[in-house]
A protein has these predicted regions:
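A charged, well-structured terminal subsegment
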Residues: 112, 174-203
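Short glycine/serine/threonine-rich phosphate/pyrophosphate-binding segments
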Residues: 52-57, 128-135, 157
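Generic N-terminal amphipathic, Lys/Arg-enriched alpha-helix
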Residues: 1-22
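Glycine-centered short loops/turns at secondary-structure junctions
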Residues: 41-42, 117, 143
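Short, glycine/polar-rich helix-capping loops at beta-to-alpha or helix-loop-helix junctions
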Residues: 149-161
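A short, well-structured juxtamembrane/interface segment
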Residues: 22-40
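Short beta->alpha connector loops at strand-helix junctions that form conserved
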Residues: 87, 124, 150, 165-173
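Glycine-rich, small/polar surface segments that engage phosphate groups of diverse ligands
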Residues: 36-113
Length: 203
């Protein structure tokens, strides 16, 4: 944990340095995948454990509500982004964990929901969470699109994902913070494209 060794100024400086090293092309591809899912009417599933699990919930909430302006949220004619966090059905997760195995909690949901062309965003700081890997492996076999968010050395997730964004850093807290920080740019980019505003405004 970097905060044990670094004071506030050094910690913020380190965070700034790490952000500058991020693959910005991968950030754009991340947004592209989500926008394509919206265009094609596909579902987006987001999953992770612990802090990454709450990030999955946060991303799902933002993508569900904030890809359209609040002024049109009552307009039923507007096309919506179909997005679901697989971390939020506590009863289902507990039932699968208790009756089958904890490494099945995401893949069992995908078996019910997932279809070819849907997008799976898999978040794992270590890249080695068995329940995340099982879900990604299933998604790959069934022609879903898989995009991983990883830290440390990327683990196995970085090897099996179809695409992804990697934070090369051995500090879980900062990795999780960076994942969510970058997501907010992705959200803004997708919003701008769907609504033809900002950089995507019609000339």
């Amino acid at each position: 944990m970097l905060g044990i060794q670094l004071n506030t100024e050094a910690y913020v400086d380190r965070l700034q340095d790490e952000l500058k090293q991020i693959d910005q092309v991968a950030m754009q591809r991340w947004a592209d995948h989500i926008y394509r899912a919206w265009e094609q009417g596909r579902f987006v599933y987001i999953l992770g454990n612990g802090g990454s699990g709450t990030t999955a919930s946060h991303m799902s909430e933002d993508l569900g509500k904030s890809t359209l302006p609040e002024s049109v949220l009552h307009d039923e004619s507007r096309k919506r982004l179909k997005v679901l966090s697989l971390t939020d059905n506590a009863g289902w997760i507990m039932a699968v964990g208790n009756d089958l195995a904890y490494d099945q909690i995401f893949v069992q949901q995908l078996m019910n929901y997932g279809g070819a062309g849907d997008l799976v965003i898999a978040i794992s700081g270590s890249g080695n969470s068995p329940n995340v890997l099982n879900a990604v492996e299933w998604a790959n076999r069934h022609e879903l699109v898989t995009f991983g968010l990883t830290g440390y050395n990327g683990g196995r997730l970085k090897q099996i994902q179809q695409d992804g964004l990697h934070v090369q850093l051995d500090d879980m807290g900062m990795v999780e913070s960076i994942h969510l920080c970058l997501f907010h740019w992705v959200l803004n980019d997708v919003h701008a494209r769907i609504n033809s505003v900002g950089r995507y405004a019609a000339n």
